[in-house]
Amino acid sequence: MNVIAIMNHMGVYFKEEPIRELHRALERLDFRIVYPNDRDDLLKLIENNSRLCGVIFDWDKYNLELCEEISKMNEYMPLYAFANTYSTLDVSLNDLRMQVRFFEYALGAAEDIANKIKQNTDEYIDTILPPLTKALFKYVREGKYTFCTPGHMGGTAFQKSPVGSIFYDFFGSNTMKSDISISVSELGSLLDHSGPHKEAEEYIARVFNAERSYMVTNGTSTANKIVGMYSAPAGSTVLIDRNCHKSLTHLMMMSDITPIYFRPTRNAYGILGGIPQSEFQHATIAKRVKETPNATWPVHAVITNSTYDGLLYNTDFIKKTLDVKSIHFDSAWVPYTNFSPIYEGKCGMSGGRVEGKVIYETQSTHKLLAAFSQASMIHVKGDVNEETFNEAYMMHTTTSPHYGIVASTETAAAMMKGNAGERLIDGSIERSIKFRKEIKRLKGESDGWFFDVWQPEHIDGPECWPLRSDSAWHGFKNIDNEHMYLDPIKVTLLTPGMKKDGTMDDFGIPASIVAKYLDEHGIVVEKTGPYNLLFLFSIGIDKTKALSLLRALTDFKRAFDLNLRVKNMLPSLYREDPEFYENMRIQDLAQNIHKLIEHHNLPDLMFRAFEVLPSMVMTPYAAFQKELHGQTEEVYLEEMVGRVNANMILPYPPGVPLVMPGEMITEESRPVLEFLQMLCEIGAHYPGFETDIHGAYRQADGRYTVKVLKEENNK
């Protein structure tokens, strides 16, 4: 970080010559000097060059107005105002809180001023670095000799082998040196929450509006289990979102708890909807408790917020209405909601305490903020027994954490602190809205078909768009007003083939074909539904990436309309089965898959498959125990009606469990089986389009098997 911007448009010798001297003095201290053309150019530079560490300007020309604009972008940026003897310094105490230092134009003072700028730059870096990351950097710079783990010893061991040297060169020196042992006492302990680790947790809690925060190094899958193990002791009953992540199914397999499922909605596109408000009411819960064997009043509830497709709840309503001691919002997909006013009241940590309740929010820091994979956080608001909670935390946390992951978690929080964090999220929202508008423009101008966007008909400024009962765009039936909102950052594109009400069109382009084309051109889709594709406009998405996606979509339309051969348009798919795809053209492929989906009446089948849950014969915990005792057998998929499932079955997408361990598909819930069979049939007919179904195993003959409990153990 060594870039200094100089606004040098003085036009007079007594101002320009001292600045020229300062330029030379700063270069001797290894600073790189840039000269913005004007105020707007400077602000663009600050926005686009995060390594800028100071701005030098003439006080008479720019004054406080420029300082205020820079401070809104980065309140810690050092500012150096040069004034002459006759300048008027009309500055209040409040103004002096900005990082402004004053110097006088004087020849021969450059060395002294440059040294002060170097000192201020060091202080700036020290100020913006969070505590653990700062301590880690300091330790690495000290270069101590250690006789403890890890065995590669700062990368030295790797360099004793040719292949190890290649590995070392790829990842670099600092990656190796920062991979250190928990024996390094000056960095404290992640497990004991001591030293700089404790300071990091306190820092994160302040940034995320939590009372207590924990860093988790094995993803939100682990964070969810930590919260669940503490909040739901064995023998208790828990309310769980049926659209939960599979980590919560694993929690139920590990802990002997009785689940009662919230039943979310789903529209014709297969987009996951929210849990209706009635599901949170005391009367509804009481009825479910009465209907569920061995259930007692729930002690804990888990809600996925946001949904995979970007729907956020009115969390204030849930916190107020839900009659349980603790509520866990699994917010893996929205770690940024504390940093824009459009998310107020739509996330777990918004607002203050809730009397008599503990609110948890787990977030995948790595998913949409800037952190290494597996970086996650647990935020807490309310009274918990910290010693007992830490037992659950230690149970699921390695004693050898990777300090790079831990430091990246803290750095992600530092990036979101203050005005800079708000600007990052505002930028993501702005880019996503521009992209949405561009898609709508291209659709309006296109001959024939083009992609559409799942959103209200008219969008303008930044907001989370409410799903209303009098609006048709969202495709959900009987929606509650002021309950669910669409996050602008989650962009779902629609392909031709299905209307909002689920009516199938004669012409269709299954989204999986578009996803394969985009993948051929270096663009990875987050999620693919039958006729929709999900794109995440995280803070790492810039204008170039957004334009590349637009270009690829228009290129797909052009190639599709030309009806190119599959082997030319989708070479990777062609290689899956060259003989099958040899003479096939893209329009034939699209129409054939579309007709297969239409044959199965996908919208109706999907609705029925998720409307009636399989019967819970035993808890996931009990079913898993039987599997561990070897009391399972494999049957073909079509034979699973009337059999108790041993494993969860979940298709990707969307990656939420369709059948839980211990559940049985009955005649009433047969549509669940028919939905799975449809997914398998598409893959059987068209090589390369197989659906990844966790819990179903494809055999050599192309048929799928599942694990069920042996008949004598279905008790």
Model-derived regions: residue spans:
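Generic beta-strand/beta-sheet core signal
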Residues: 216, 241, 262, 303-304, ...
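Short, surface-exposed alpha-helical segments at coil->helix boundaries
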Residues: 16-20, 198, 249
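Non-catalytic terminal extensions of PLP-dependent enzymes
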Residues: 9-30, 37-57, 64, 70-77, ...
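Conserved PLP-enzyme active-site core in the AAT-like
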Residues: 36-45, 58, 65-68, 76, ...
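Short hydrophobic beta-strand segments
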Residues: 1-16, 238-241
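A short, charged/proline- and glycine-enriched loop
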Residues: 1-4, 50, 210-211, 234-235, ...
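Conserved N-terminal alpha-helix of the aminotransferase class I/II PLP-enzyme fold
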Residues: 174-222
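Generic structural signal for residues in well-ordered beta-strands
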Residues: 33-34, 213, 259, 525
